[in-house]
Regions:
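SAM-dependent methyltransferases
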Residues: 77-79, 96, 106-120
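Conserved core of the sugar-phosphate nucleotidyltransferase
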Residues: 2-90
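A short, conserved beta-strand element in the Rossmann-like catalytic core
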Residues: 1-2, 98
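Conserved active-site beta-strand element of glycosyltransferases/polysaccharide synthases
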Residues: 89-93, 99-102
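Helix N-cap/beta->alpha junction signal
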Residues: 25, 102-103
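A short acidic, often aromatic-flanked loop/helix-cap motif at beta-alpha or helix-coil junctions
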Residues: 30-32, 97-100
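Residues at or immediately preceding the N-termini of alpha-helices
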Residues: 61, 104-107
Length: 120
């Protein structure tokens, strides 16, 4: 319910335009740093080319079926499986409202966003 319609439109349009695998992405806003084994901060990772991958992800049916049939490796999402096949994954604009809901804080944020949308 949090994904704005334009994100779905972007994903579907990219698949229809010939991309076999598509993910919505948003720029990272946090500073990203490496951390060494002794918990010391290492280098700051330049974030200008980094993006957070969101859902919904889009695929042609044959590519997604092949990925699920052939990939038996640890991955975090379907796009990771498709990449293991050597297939490029295309990025489209996502939206900050389409965040992943996995932690208790995410539930609070999602509820607040839903309430905000309901009352505007």
């Amino acid at each position: 319910p949090l994904v704005p319609p334009e994100v779905i439109t972007n994903v579907v349009a990219a698949v229809r335009n010939g991309h076999a695998a598509v993910v919505p992405v948003v720029p990272l806003v946090d500073t990203i740093r490496t951390v060494t084994g002794d918990a010391s901060l290492g280098a700051t990772v330049p974030r200008d080319s980094l993006r957070a991958v969101q859902t919904p992800q889009g695929f042609t049916r044959d590519v997604l079926q092949r990925a699920h049939a052939e990939v038996d490796a640890p991955v975090t999402d379907d796009a990771g499986m498709v990449e293991r096949l050597g297939i490029a994954v295309h990025a489209v604009d996502g939206h900050e409202d389409a965040f992943k809901v996995t932690r208790p804080l995410d539930v609070v944020l999602a509820e607040a966003l839903i309430e905000h949308r309901r009352t505007r």
